[in-house]
């Protein structure tokens, strides 16, 4: 894992859920958790990052709403700054669909919240 990827995983960890790269979620994972898909970009480039939080249980709706509020505080309108070994990033909300509410296609009891971010990388 690169310094950028680890820094983003740690940043998203501030949402108080375990964070896994998409496709690498351990079989023994329990709800709730967050999956993350990171694009690759060279320094001075920008890339899209998608994080999806998944919830199951009686409080899934309330937990999902609380996470959405927390994500809006973590990534304010003006963006958030992140530094890591060898570089830095500005993290912004991606367009008009920053947060999208989801239901799992296989199990309608599983609720999700997709968070889309635009990340601009800088060389330090």
Where are these regions (language model features)?
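Charged, amphipathic alpha-helical segments and their flanking helix caps
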Residues: 1-23, 37-124
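A short, hydrophobic beta-strand-centered structural micro-motif
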Residues: 29-38
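Short, glycine-/polar-rich solvent-exposed loops and beta-turns at beta-strand/coil boundaries
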Residues: 25-27
């Amino acid at each position: 894992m690169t310094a950028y990827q680890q820094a983003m995983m740690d940043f998203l960890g501030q949402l108080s859920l375990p964070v896994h790269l998409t496709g690498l979620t351990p079989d023994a994972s329990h709800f709730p958790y967050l999956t993350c898909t990171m694009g690759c970009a060279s320094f001075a480039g920008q890339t899209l990052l998608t994080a999806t939080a998944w919830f199951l249980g009686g409080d899934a709706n309330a937990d999902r709403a609380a996470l959405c509020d927390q994500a809006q505080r973590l990534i304010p309108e003006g963006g958030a700054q992140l530094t890591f070994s060898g570089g830095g990033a500005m993290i912004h909300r991606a367009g008009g669909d920053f947060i999208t509410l989801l239901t799992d296609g296989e199990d309608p009891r599983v609720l999700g919240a997709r968070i889309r971010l635009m990340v601009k990388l800088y060389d330090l």
